């Protein structure tokens, strides 16, 4: 079971191909973070496969997996986007776009045939991808006076947040990133250091 502050995604673009009754289904799984990125990839693949009969897709965004869409691109309703999304869901993936391009082979597949083909093509692309589990991280900025540097650095060493930025004058600043589930503890420890202030 995935923890609340982790999610599964893919590291790089991966492809899969499925053929059924001379129809060719080319699937591309792409890691994405925003709707804008999704639009760019869709534009690029629609241009690349301009001669294809259909370019269908599904995506999932956000570590909570609540932002998703499935598109049939002219195929009968529910026969393309939904089975693609089903493969994303069965692998518990997010921040992912899966596009399936169909070249019609002259023989109709029927509704159930299309569902099987789009599902199989999406499964091939996802199977070819490297799936990783990532943490949901949060950032915090703390300001403190230089004489209390050792206290701050001891906490950083023990709790192991990533140091994103730091500046050392009489007033020092440090921007840190740590996994969401550990943020409460880190914040509480930093706030106990004399002169330390959390900057929102």
Residue ranges and their predicted role:
Residues 143-160:
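Short amphipathic alpha-helix segments
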Residues 46, 88-89, 119, 123-130, ...:
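Signal for well-folded cores of large energy- and translation-related assemblies
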Residues 28, 55-57, 95-98, 139, ...:
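Structural motif
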Residues 80-128:
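Active-site beta-strand/loop microenvironment that shapes enzyme catalytic pockets
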Residues 176, 182-185:
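Terminal, non-globular segments
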Residues 131-146, 174-176:
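Short glycine-/aliphatic-rich beta-strand segments at the starts of folded cytosolic domains
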Residues 162-168, 192-200:
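Conserved short beta-strand edge segments in small beta-sheet-based binding/regulatory domains
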Residues 1-78, 165, 192:
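C-terminal regulatory domains involved in ligand/effector binding and gene-expression control
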């Amino acid at each position: 079971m995935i923890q609340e502050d982790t999610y599964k995604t893919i590291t790089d673009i991966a492809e899969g191909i499925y053929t059924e009754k001379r129809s060719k289904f080319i699937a591309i799984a792409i890691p994405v973070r925003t709707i804008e990125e999704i639009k760019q990839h869709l534009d690029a693949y629609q241009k690349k496969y301009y001669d294809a009969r259909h370019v269908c897709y599904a995506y999932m965004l956000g570590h909570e997996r609540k932002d998703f869409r499935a598109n049939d691109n002219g195929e009968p309703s529910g026969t393309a986007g939904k089975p693609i999304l089903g493969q994303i869901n069965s692998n518990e993936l997010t921040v992912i776009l899966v596009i399936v391009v169909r070249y019609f082979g002259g023989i109709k597949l029927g509704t159930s045939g299309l569902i099987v083909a789009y599902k199989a093509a999406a499964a091939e692309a996802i199977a070819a991808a490297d799936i990783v589990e990532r943490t949901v991280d949060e950032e915090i900025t703390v300001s403190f006076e230089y004489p209390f540097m050792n206290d701050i650095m001891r906490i950083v060493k023990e709790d192991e947040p990533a140091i994103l930025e730091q500046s050392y004058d009489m007033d020092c600043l440090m921007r840190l990133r740590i996994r969401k589930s550990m943020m409460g503890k880190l914040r509480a420890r930093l706030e106990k250091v004399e002169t330390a202030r959390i900057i929102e």
